[in-house]
Curated annotation (Swiss-Prot):
Gene from which the chain derives: CFAP300
Source species, domain of life: Eukaryota
Annotated keywords: Cell projection, Cytoplasm, Cytoskeleton
Location (main, coarse): cytoplasm
Matches recorded under InterPro entries: CFAP300 (IPR029416)
Protein name: Cilia- and flagella-associated protein 300
Single Gene Ontology BP annotation: inner dynein arm assembly
Keyword Cytoplasm part of the UniProt annotation: yes
Record carries keyword Membrane: no
GO cellular component: cytoplasm; cytoskeleton; motile cilium
Subcellular location: Cytoplasm; Cytoplasm, Cytoskeleton, Cilium axoneme
Amino acid sequence: MQIESDNQVTNQSYSFFRQENTILDDKKFMEILQKWGLQHSIKVSTFLFDIKFDHLNPNQFLLDLFNSKDVRGSLHYVSFKQNVLLSQIKFQPLTCKSIKLDLFDKLTEDKIVVKGHIKQCFEEQFENIQIADELRKALVLEDSEQYCVFNEADRQELLFKLFQILVLGGQLCQYEDEIQAYLDWTKYLYKNTVNARKYADKDEIYIDSYAYDIRKLENSYSSDHPQNVMYVVVNPSLRIVNIIENQWLKVW
């Protein structure tokens, strides 16, 4: 379900302050991103915000976020009009429930991954993305039998969205024959984006984060390719918001 915000006046207004983000400073992560053709396309920005996050009214938060000068000056793939504030944003709420990678056990159960190896298939193209194995079919080819491995609820998990970015890669991508590297680095990116907390009264962990898939920023940004994505991840107890951007950069 996509939501279109409007610029309604509320009693609160958020301010945002740029913070250093070290997710992309990890040498091994950058090496694998280079292998997957993502080293120049994937970006992560972090900001502090000043007042309590109202999860019942994400519209106001997102409008204030993308109208902030600090945020506008930090994003890589949005063409904001100077001195023109946004009044509308189309976005889709995502779920952040996963604390393990068991979402991807389905790949083994459905024989897309066998003993850690990704099952190969005849090569085809989808939106200039090379589809040469059944994993990529399961991610983006809606008319394939592999696509039904993940249901709609699975696909609206932030964990799934991050996994898809890494698996599909960029135009100059050296794909993996085995699944483990995709799982390991999805876990790394997810772990460093969301806020995991422990319940006060029991020894269990939960994710204290809210995530949003930004579909369109009025006259400034539109997601028109499977790899053109922007996710906003709000960590209320830390008053930190992370913005993950990726673009399909054409090499030829």
